[in-house]
């Protein structure tokens, strides 16, 4: 019985562990990083579970432009649980209409599933659809994932 106590405490503390930010997107840095105004302070958000092409990489600017068209200047909701080693909030971003932006970017072929860290079971399904439909970066015969591209540089 004692071995279940930490699990029960974790489950009941879950709502406390996650938080939301509601704010206007003041900057789109790339296809997976935005800045949101939260209480008069810009907060950097890294979209969790996805990895978009780097700006200098093939499809990088296109991915950034896609993100801009979705959220730039708009009020979004960010649900998050933690920060990364750079201090960015790792968050799930929702557009004003409730659309899951992280999932949209993968579905459009504007980002990869960050498989090493992914916790969203829907994303691999969306990525397979995008690949089969040759959407976005999947129109390339052999797209290079950003984590490999960064390693080569």
From Swiss-Prot:
Per its UniProt record, what SMART domains does this chain match?
Answer: SNc
Disulfide bond sites: none
Which keywords annotate this record? Endonuclease, Hydrolase, Nuclease, Plasmid, Signal
The EC category is hydrolase
Signal peptide as annotated in the record? 1-19
Catalytic residues at 46, 54, 88
Q: Which domain of life is it from?
A: Bacteria
- Database matches in Gene3D superfamilies: 2.40.50.90
Q: Report whether Transcription shows up as a keyword of the record.
A: no
Q: What is this protein called?
A: Uncharacterized endonuclease
Spell out the family assignment given in the record's similarity comment: Belongs to the thermonuclease family.
Q: Which CDD domains match?
A: SNc
Q: What is its EC number?
A: 3.1.-.-
Question: What does the record give under GO molecular function?
Answer: endonuclease activity; nucleic acid binding
InterPro entries registered for this protein in UniProt: SNase_OB-fold_sf, Staphylococal_nuclease_OB-fold, Thermonucl_AS
């Amino acid at each position: 019985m004692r071995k279940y106590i930490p699990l029960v405490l974790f489950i009941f503390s879950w709502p406390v562990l996650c938080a939301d930010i509601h704010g206007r997107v003041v900057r789109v840095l790339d296809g997976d990083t935005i800045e949101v105004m939260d209480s008069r302070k810009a907060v950097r958000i890294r979209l969790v579970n996805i990895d978009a092409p780097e700006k200098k990489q093939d499809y990088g600017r296109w991915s950034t432009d896609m993100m801009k068209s979705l959220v730039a200047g708009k009020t979004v909701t960010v649900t998050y649980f933690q920060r990364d080693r750079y201090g960015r909030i790792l968050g799930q971003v929702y557009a004003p209409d409730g659309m899951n932006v992280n999932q949209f970017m993968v579905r459009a072929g504007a980002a990869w599933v960050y498989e090493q860290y992914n916790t969203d079971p829907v994303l691999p399904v969306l990525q397979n659809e995008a690949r089969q439909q040759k959407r976005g970066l999947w129109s390339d015969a052999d797209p290079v994932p950003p984590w490999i591209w960064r390693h080569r540089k």
